[in-house]
Every structure is written in structure tokens, then in C-alpha cells.
Amino acid sequence: MRKKKFLSRFAFGSLFLLCGTILSACTGIQADLRNLIKEATGKDIDLSKSIKTTDGKKNIITSSKKSYEVNPKDTTKLLLEAWKQSFEEGKLGIAELAFDQATNPTKNSDFKMERKVEYFNMEYKSFSDFSVNARLSYIFNWYGSYFGEKSFTANNGGKHNFDLFLSIKSHSKKQFTEKSFIVKDENFQDQDKSQQIITEWIQLDLSLIWSLKGQDELSRKSLDKIFLKDYITYSANEKQINLFTYLQHLIK
């Protein structure tokens, strides 16, 4: 039987290597995942319905695992493209980039934080050989007065603007394999009641580093005075992301 060619609309030969980046205007993740699963398992899964239930999510992961076993090349490309598309739409999947540890405790700080992904460029050969360079912009809009440490003040109507330059690389030792597709059922007792935790996970190990810089003189001077001072530089050699969260975001 002639093998079907899926993902042709992506023109992956040029998609992943054109100017060293992935093109951002890609669609059809859901349709192509459905085709890859059908090719691998012989089953036609309605992803839109399956993604709404626990059993359905488990089925998507186990079926995606089978797809990776049968067609690792196209499955890899699809998972990476889902990551890129979702990240560009604001589904970051990296908790540290939300600055929750810095901003949540400061409930008396009258500001609103805006975040935007300016670009997300990926160079790719395989799961064990990829790199990402991205830039995110953050704006702190102050609607109250704030008096902080080191004589830092912010007034109503003021703004602080920052750029975050992010670099991600594949993990040097931990490889992506069929074992990276994980479904776990864990039972435990909580106040004499049996509880169950379902874990749906497509694990990708990586390392990342970023630097945070002020866009203007005021923001640059204030950066080491406010609660973001611990976020000026950040690095993690042992980081995991869940690729399934990006599929969930894109499957409608």
C-alpha cells in the first residue's frame, strides 16, 4: 500500500530551515494529528470530543505515542509546531515566565502586567538537536502609587517596559523517546476519601536561560529596585515542559 503523505501543506523541508526558523503562519495541527493517528492505529479519533474527557485525553496520548513509533519524523515536527503556535498565542507552558512568584505576593502593588510574545524562532534537526530564541515584552501599567525598597516609587498612570530574551536548547543527555508519552493514574487517601490524580504528559527535557532588560532609561534604572530583581537573569539546566498542553490549546 502506498504510504500517505501527511503534513504536506507545511512544506517541512523549507518550514523548519528557511532562514533558520519555523514559519509562524501554519495551520492544520488538529487535522494532521488526526491523520497521523489514523495512519498509525487505523482509528479515526474525533479529537475535539476526546480532548474534553479524561479517557479521551489518555487515548490521544497513547495514540500519539503509537504515531511516534510508526512515523517519528512527522510526529516530531507536528509536536514542535504545536509548541511554536501555542507559545506565539500566549500559551507559554513555562510557569516562571508568568512571574507569579514575584507579582502575586505584592497584592498592595497597584499595577496590571501585560505580556506579549514578540517572536519565537526555532532551529530544528530532531528532538535531541533543537534551539529556540524568543523575545517577550512585559508592560507594568500602574494605576496606584507604590513605594518600594531602594527608594523606588511608581505613580498612577506610570509604565515600566521590559524585554525578556529567552534561549532554549535540547537537553544534552535526556532523550525524547516513546517513554516520553506518559499517562498515570495515582490513587491516594485524603481525609478518609479516596482521590485519584490523572496525569497526561508528553515530556520534553530541555535547558533554558533568559535575561530581562528595561526598554527605556526609567525601566532600566528601576529593574533592580522592584520585585523583578530576582528575574533579571534566570537559567535552568534541568527543565521539563509538557508538549500535550500545547496540543490541548490548539485542539478545538
From Swiss-Prot:
<feature type="signal peptide">
    <location>
        <begin position="1"/>
        <end position="25"/>
    </location>
</feature>
<protein>
    <recommendedName>
        <fullName>Uncharacterized lipoprotein MPN_411</fullName>
    </recommendedName>
</protein>
<keyword id="KW-1003">Cell membrane</keyword>
<comment type="similarity">
    <text>Belongs to the MG439/MG440 family.</text>
</comment>
<feature type="lipid moiety-binding region" description="S-diacylglycerol cysteine">
    <location>
        <position position="26"/>
    </location>
</feature>
<dbReference type="GO" id="GO:0005886">
    <property type="term" value="C:plasma membrane"/>
</dbReference>
<keyword id="KW-0732">Signal</keyword>
<keyword id="KW-0564">Palmitate</keyword>
<keyword id="KW-0449">Lipoprotein</keyword>
<keyword id="KW-0472">Membrane</keyword>
<feature type="lipid moiety-binding region" description="N-palmitoyl cysteine">
    <location>
        <position position="26"/>
    </location>
</feature>
<dbReference type="Pfam" id="PF00938">
    <property type="entry name" value="Lipoprotein_3"/>
</dbReference>
<dbReference type="InterPro" id="IPR001595">
    <property type="entry name" value="Lipoprotein_3"/>
</dbReference>
